[in-house]
Regions:
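Active-site-proximal, Lys/Arg-enriched surface segment
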Residues: 86-171, 178, 182
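Conserved short loop/turn motifs at secondary-structure junctions
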Residues: 55-56, 88, 218-223
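An internal, acidic/charged active-site-proximal segment
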Residues: 180-249
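Short, glycine/acidic-rich beta->alpha junctions
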Residues: 62, 96, 144, 222-226
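Alpha-helix C-cap/termination motif
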Residues: 61, 73, 107-110, 210, ...
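Phosphate-ester processing/binding pockets and catalytic centers
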Residues: 30-44, 52, 61, 77, ...
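Gly/serine-rich nucleotide phosphate-binding loop at the start of the catalytic core
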Residues: 2-3, 8-14, 20-84
């Protein structure tokens, strides 16, 4: 059930993700199998079980996929337990990410794979969300009150998927004027400001150090072209070719 790529076409078309009735009918069984492989990433069974409920809610037909409607919709769901899962549960994030990368390598890994770095914005109405600010929102093409995330994706002739993400926190959030908001959002004490290219560079260095995903190419837009941090990370690596967009000005 992987995307089909038409590599003979120019320009390269967006690959299609083909699904039929059998994929839909057996989806929950496949989701359970997927969920099971992350059991050892949790020290307690309760948060691991709530992960499945959260995933089930995200894949449901609910119009609003916030915690309360999802908890009330899925089997065994409890609103307070689901809220604690999101706000307080502890899991081994690094282990989960490596397991995810192992799955990707097995399903679509290729020596000619491509690592792609870019950011995307999510419009927000209020100011309670971590890192929310009036800033450029690429998803709508203008400045808006939003959160912005930096994303890493993997693509090959066998398919494509996201492989990492991190929330970008604007510099003003680290000023004294935002101290209460940082505390409310439970920012770690050691968290410091990083530019989007710095975040992407750290993602790239970790992916390369883990040696799980095979790749030959690195691609990013002009935001990363102008960053010495990102260029230093991707340049002069034997066997790796990078493609970075050049701004018109």
């Amino acid at each position: 059930m992987l995307p089909e790529c038409r590599t003979e076409c120019v320009p390269f078309p967006i690959p299609k993700f083909n699904m039929d009735k059998s994929d839909i009918d057996g989806f929950m069984d496949k989701l359970k199998t997927f969920h099971e492989q992350f059991r050892d990433c949790f020290s307690r069974s309760e948060p691991w079980e709530n992960l499945f409920r959260y995933l089930s809610g995200q894949f449901s037909g609910l119009e609003r996929k916030s915690i309360e409607p999802m908890a009330l919709h899925v089997e065994g769901g409890d609103v307070r337990c689901m809220q604690r899962f999101i706000s307080d549960a502890v899991w081994n994030d690094d282990k989960i990410l490596k397991r995810h990368h192992e799955n990707i390598s097995e399903d679509m890994g290729d020596k000619d794979g491509v690592l792609i770095f870019d950011e995307s914005g999510f419009v927000k109405k209020g100011d309670d969300s971590a890192g929310v600010s009036r800033q450029y929102c690429g998803s709508i093409g203008k400045v808006e009150n939003c959160q912005v995330g930096v994303f890493a994706a993997y693509a090959s002739r066998h398919g494509y998927t996201l492989i990492d993400d991190q929330l970008f926190i604007p510099q003003k959030w680290f000023e004294d004027s935002h101290k209460e908001r940082r505390e409310k959002c439970r920012f770690p004490e050691d968290l410091s400001f990083k530019t989007k290219p710095q975040i992407a560079a750290e993602m790239f260095q970790k992916i390369r150090a883990d040696q799980i995903l095979p790749f030959k190419y690195v691609a990013a837009d002009s935001v990363y072209t102008n960053s010495e941090d990102f260029l230093d990370a991707v340049e002069n690596i034997p066997g790796v070719v990078y493609f970075l967009a050049i701004p018109s000005d």
